[in-house]
């Protein structure tokens, strides 16, 4: 009888299967096999506590049946889902669905997907950690309660489609606060006095008549000119020369947040893209040794490194760079995050032997770039510090002092691998008390800059420092805010949209703890305590739920509705009522103000450019774009009285290329294409790129696997569906 190993992803299952003999069967759960019901709160709440109502997703039902049948035939079923709390919970749900005692399922975890790692963990299984599971359940229930209850309230007071959530709203407030600093900012002009002394010493005025000048202090142009005129007449000497040796410490290896930050700044990758590529590198790619994982687990807040990996790195440094670059002892790093899960490892290559050059014919260009970044950072983390000599020279006269600074690299250390963008700034050879001639003195104007908007990388850095969310939530949180149209990211800068201001205004006034970073961080600590058996998850939920629901009820009464519908001056053709403009998550539309008694609606004039000025040849009505399982088409807005439809293929204004959506594989344009079998969406770079989708791709990312989403009709309901993992979100629902 075969042994069964259950992992999360098909790619991981395929890789692991290559390492094992025929006595093992490896199957993927494809993420969560069950979750809270999507069409209700999904939690029973009474005096006994909080009972989640888990439902198997329709797309997982056949898979679950398959896993149950395989488990019945297996002598041992190993739960080998990811090592974080989410993975522990997925393993727990799989075991529950199979049935039997939880203790009967050996639990194995691995930081890397290599043959040795897999064979070793099979020898040392443990049990499913219910404390970790309860921590994940508490997080899931908390987020559902906040999202479901608060989103419903926000949508009822502002407009349908808006949402709020425990982590997303705290993150959004950071963006809003920065916008509030930027919008009223008024630039200030200030002046500096910059001198050039012979032989070529550049210095800046730091004090005048015994008073030190503060940064941006000199704002009067006339005053700056007067000081310049006075100092030009003075004689100068070298007042002091200070030289100091300074170390540039080696950077630690990557954890999730720092990998996302570096990939953003150095490679231009979004956090979502970084995690998607990292997942592929972790789960298994082609190498000269066969298919295997080439990096360790990518969702981690730990800086620990396995002893064997440290020894490999040190041996590599000694061999390739010599003993001068090798510290006496291996360098050990610890995370600044007090809640870091130190049992995990930092992100590193699974084998230091697999140099980037050895993989250039096996990895895609972007995979190779990210792997190279991880490889070099890990190897550099075990090298000697770089050493600099800093110089500071003060030039003085009776009325003022000028200062010049320089730096010289003495030993490159870790820069040997990572490179050094800072060029040496060498100062001329000088002696204290020697006279020096002023060659030129200039008064230069400068303008203060507003606070910089967050980039995705800098926002993640702040979220991490404040304890908001965990490594697994940083990228999905930013994607979620984009998908909700709260923020936009242009040229690496995050700016808030107007709907975000309205939501945060309400939350700050009525639910201040939801947007308080300290509150969010304290909840993360509570979840950590649950995972460590220091807190009861039912009590944590209870302590949060009842005060929160009191505020929800108060909000229903006290929050003033901001829904204002613009009048069109037109009458409803069905009941004679007034037509007004409304908004939904699908955009602007026109509806009768007698709703719900009258349900007449039509689209605005600027909606759906494809249908603009297109009239129904049967009744004279307006042809509007609609969607079916076969894609987009035109239909008369007088349906059901008129059932005229028209293919977009024959529409003069139809757009073949999808605006604002790029291919997730190569970055090319995506266009509607046709074959004998029907229409589909494909990449314009075909045949170099084979991306295709049966449904129209949209500029949103899957919150589960971060791949591109599509829009479709599923069982007569509008839905967004991931093109890769098929995760589906019905647009009628909004759980936040």
Curated annotation (Swiss-Prot):
Query: InterPro entries of this UniProt entry?
Result: Topo_IA, Topo_IA_2, Topo_IA_AS, Topo_IA_cen, Topo_IA_cen_sub1, Topo_IA_cen_sub2, Topo_IA_cen_sub3, Topo_IA_core_domain
Its keywords, alphabetically, are: DNA-binding, Isomerase, Magnesium, Metal-binding, Repeat, Topoisomerase, Zinc, Zinc-finger
Looking at the keywords, is Membrane present? no
Question: Enzyme class, one word?
Answer: isomerase
UniProt binding sites for Mg(2+): 8, 82
Q: Where is the Topo IA-type catalytic domain?
A: 129-552
Where is the segment annotated Interaction with DNA? 163-168
Q: Name one GO cellular component term.
A: chromosome
Alphabetically, the GO molecular function entries are:
DNA binding; DNA topoisomerase type I (single strand cut, ATP-independent) activity; zinc ion binding
Q: What is its EC number?
A: 5.6.2.1
What Pfam family is a match for this entry?
Answer: Topoisom_bac
Where does the entry annotate site (Interaction with DNA)?
32, 139-140, 143, 299, 484
Q: Which reaction does it catalyse?
A: ATP-independent breakage of single-stranded DNA, followed by passage and rejoining
Catalytic site residues? 297 (o-(5'-phospho-dna)-tyrosine intermediate)
| Superkingdom as given in the UniProt entry | Bacteria
Alphabetized PANTHER family for the sequence? DNA TOPOISOMERASE (PTHR42785:SF1), DNA TOPOISOMERASE, TYPE IA, CORE (PTHR42785)
Q: Which family does it belong to?
A: Belongs to the type IA topoisomerase family.
Q: How does it assemble?
A: Monomer.
Its recorded name reads: DNA topoisomerase 1
């Amino acid at each position: 009888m075969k042994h069964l190993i259950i992992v999360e992803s098909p790619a991981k299952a395929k890789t692991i299967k290559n390492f094992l003999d025929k006595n093992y069967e490896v199957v993927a759960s494809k993420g969560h096999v069950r979750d809270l019901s999507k069409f209700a709160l999904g939690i029973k709440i009474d005096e006994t506590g909080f009972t989640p109502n888990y439902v198997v997703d329709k797309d997982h039902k056949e898979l679950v049946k398959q896993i149950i049948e395989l488990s019945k035939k297996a002598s041992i079923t190993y739960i080998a889902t990811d090592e974080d709390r989410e993975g522990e919970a997925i393993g727990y749900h799989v075991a529950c669905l199979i049935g039997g005692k939880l203790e009967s399922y050996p639990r194995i975890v691995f930081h890397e997907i290599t043959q040795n790692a897999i064979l070793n963990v099979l020898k040392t299984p443990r049990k499913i950690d219910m404390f970790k599971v309860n921590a994940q359940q508490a997080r899931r229930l908390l987020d559902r309660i906040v999202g479901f209850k608060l989103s419903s309230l926000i949508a009822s007071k502002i407009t349908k489609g808006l949402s709020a959530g425990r982590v997303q709203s705290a993150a959004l407030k950071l963006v809003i606060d920065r916008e509030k600093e930027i919008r009223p900012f008024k630039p200030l002009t200030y002046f500096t006095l910059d001198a050039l002394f012979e032989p070529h010493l550049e210095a800046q005025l730091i004090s005048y008549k015994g008073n030190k000048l503060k940064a941006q202090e000199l704002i009067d142009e006339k005053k700056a000119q007067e000081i310049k005129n006075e100092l030009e007449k003075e004689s100068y000497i070298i007042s002091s020369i200070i030289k100091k040796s300074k170390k540039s410490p080696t950077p630690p290896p990557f954890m999730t947040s720092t990998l996302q930050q570096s990939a953003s700044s150095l490679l231009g990758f979004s956090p979502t893209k970084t995690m998607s590529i990292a997942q592929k590198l972790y789960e298994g790619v082609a190498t000269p040794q066969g298919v295997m994982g080439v990096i360790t687990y990518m969702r981690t807040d730990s800086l620990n490194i396995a002893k064997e990996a440290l020894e490999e790195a040190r041996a590599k440094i000694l061999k390739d760079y010599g003993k001068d670059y090798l510290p006496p002892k291996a360098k050990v790093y610890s995370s600044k995050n007090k809640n870091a899960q130190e049992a995990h490892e930092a992100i590193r290559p699974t084998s230091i032997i697999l140099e980037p050059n050895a993989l250039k014919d096996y990895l895609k260009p972007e995979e190779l770039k990210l792997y190279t970044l991880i490889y070099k950072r890990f190897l550099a983390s075990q090298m000697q510090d770089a050493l600099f000599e800093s110089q500071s020279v003060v030039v003085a006269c009776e009325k003022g002092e000028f200062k010049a600074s320089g730096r010289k690299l003495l030993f490159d250390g870790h820069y040997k691998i990572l490179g050094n963008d800072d060029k040496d700034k060498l100062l001329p050879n000088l002696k204290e008390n020697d006279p020096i001639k002023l060659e030129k003195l200039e008064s230069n104007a400068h303008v203060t800059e507003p606070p910089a908007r967050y980039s995705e990388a800098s926002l993640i850095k702040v979220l991490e420092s404040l304890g908001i969310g965990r490594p697994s939530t940083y990228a999905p949180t930013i994607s979620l805010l984009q998908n909700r149209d709260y923020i936009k990211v242009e040229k690496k800068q995050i700016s808030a949209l107007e709907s975000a201001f309205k939501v945060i205004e309400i939350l700050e006034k009525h639910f201040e703890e939801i947007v308080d970073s300290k509150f969010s961080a304290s909840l993360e600590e509570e979840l950590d305590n649950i995972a460590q058996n220091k807190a009861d998850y039912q009590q944590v939920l209870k302590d949060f739920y009842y005060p929160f629901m009191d505020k929800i009820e108060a909000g229903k009464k006290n929050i003033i509705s901001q829904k204002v519908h613009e009048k069109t001056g037109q009458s409803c053709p069905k009941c004679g009522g007034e037509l007004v403009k409304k908004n939904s998550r699908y955009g602007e539309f026109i509806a009768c103000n007698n709703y719900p008694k009258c349900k007449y609606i039509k689209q605005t004039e600027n909606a759906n450019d494809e249908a603009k000025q297109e009239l129904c040849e049967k009744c004279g009505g307006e042809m509007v774009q609609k969607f079916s399982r076969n894609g987009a088409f035109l239909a008369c807005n007088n349906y059901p009285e008129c059932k005229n439809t028209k293919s977009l293929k024959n529409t003069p204004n139809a757009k073949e290329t999808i605006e604002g959506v790029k291919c997730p594989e190569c970055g090319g344009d995506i266009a509607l294409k046709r074959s004998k079998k029907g229409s589909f969406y494909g990449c314009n770079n075909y045949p170099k790129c084979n991306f295709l989708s049966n449904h129209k791709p949209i500029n949103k990312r899957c919150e589960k696997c971060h791949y591109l989403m599509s829009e479709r009709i599923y069982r007569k309901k509008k839905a967004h569906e991931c093109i890769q993992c098929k995760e589906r979100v019905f647009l009628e629902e909004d759980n936040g």
